[in-house]
């Protein structure tokens, strides 16, 4: 179960802390998972899925354990305090946006402090991503990314439905890359670290585009061509890879954010 996986991760912390970047990367992944999946557990301050809520509680506890195991530096105590605050917000069943902000801010700090890889070295090859998806992913996630592949039956938790627009808007290409690289403890999602970095980024961008249709991509292409503000939001591949539709909507508004995200997930070379 996810609970047992988290306990196992926690018990191994002193060993894993020998590699601070790996430990920080795992903490980042948990924070990203919390930011994306918390709304499935809590809505309007009420528990709507007890199993999901238990996972959120365990994941926030695990983040604190992992950060505590990292070598102290000048920001160590402050990061531990932020992790404790996030744990308290989950315990209080705080609003999803507040959870996403808190988890996202701490995750961004980890990227910077531990220099976690946050962008592809070259423009992702979407055709390669599509081919890899067909070979490696359809059994669980389904041919169109709906989480309905032939091997998905009985999986607990079920495979991610990449076409779920509500969750997709909180998920960056970077978060998909990290899950592809490391797997997700407590689920059937294994690590694909045997693939090259380029292949993993190609898969991340391809799966990150499955929630968007051709109309949204076309609208995004038109906006990108004419909207200088939109182009300033995405100056390079690093900015694009770390961006979520939800974050971009704070600057561009919901409609433009969705269209631009749809276009650039399919045409990342536009920012290169």
Which ranges hold each PLM region?
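Short Fe-S-cluster ligation motifs
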Residues: 168-184
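Axial heme c-ligation environment in periplasmic c-type cytochrome domains
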Residues: 50, 89-98, 158-160, 179-210, ...
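Mature extracytoplasmic or organellar-lumen-exposed domains after removal of signal/transit peptides
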Residues: 18-126, 131, 135-136, 216-272
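Periodic glycine anchor positions in long extracellular repeat architectures
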Residues: 142-147, 183
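Sec/Tat signal peptide C-region and signal peptidase I cleavage site
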Residues: 11-17
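The canonical Cys-X-X-Cys-His
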Residues: 129-144, 176, 203-207
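Gly/Gly-Pro-rich "capping" loops immediately C-terminal to redox-active cysteine motifs
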Residues: 46-54, 145-173, 191, 224-225
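Bacterial N-terminal signal peptides
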Residues: 1-10
């Amino acid at each position: 179960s996810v609970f047992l996986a988290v306990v196992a991760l926690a018990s191994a912390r002193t060993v894993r802390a020998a590699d601070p970047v790996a430990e920080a990367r795992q903490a980042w992944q948990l924070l990203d998972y919390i930011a994306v999946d918390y709304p499935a557990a809590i809505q309007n301050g009420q528990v709507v899925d007890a199993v999901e809520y238990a996972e959120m509680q365990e994941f926030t506890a695990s983040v604190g354990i992992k950060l505590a195991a990292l070598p102290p530096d000048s920001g160590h105590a402050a990061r531990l305090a932020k992790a404790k605050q996030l744990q308290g917000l989950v315990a209080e069943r705080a609003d999803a946006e507040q959870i996403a902000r808190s988890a996202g801010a701490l995750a961004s700090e980890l990227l910077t402090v531990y220099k976690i890889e946050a962008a592809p070295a070259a423009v992702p090859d979407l055709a390669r991503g599509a081919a890899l998806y067909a070979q490696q992913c359809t059994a669980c996630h389904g041919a169109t990314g709906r989480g309905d592949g032939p091997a998905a039956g009985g999986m607990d938790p079920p495979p991610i439905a990449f076409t779920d627009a509500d969750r997709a808007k909180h998920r960056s290409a970077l978060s998909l890359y990290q899950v592809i690289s490391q797997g997700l403890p407590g689920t059937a999602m294994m690590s694909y670290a045997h693939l090259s970095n380029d292949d993993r980024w190609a898969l991340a961008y391809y799966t990150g585009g499955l929630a968007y249709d051709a109309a949204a991509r076309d609208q995004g292409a038109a906006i990108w061509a004419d909207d200088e503000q939109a182009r300033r939001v995405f100056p390079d591949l690093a900015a694009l890879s770390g961006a979520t539709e939800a974050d971009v909507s704070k600057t561009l508004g919901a409609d433009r954010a969705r269209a631009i995200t749809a276009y650039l997930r399919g045409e990342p070379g536009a920012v290169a």
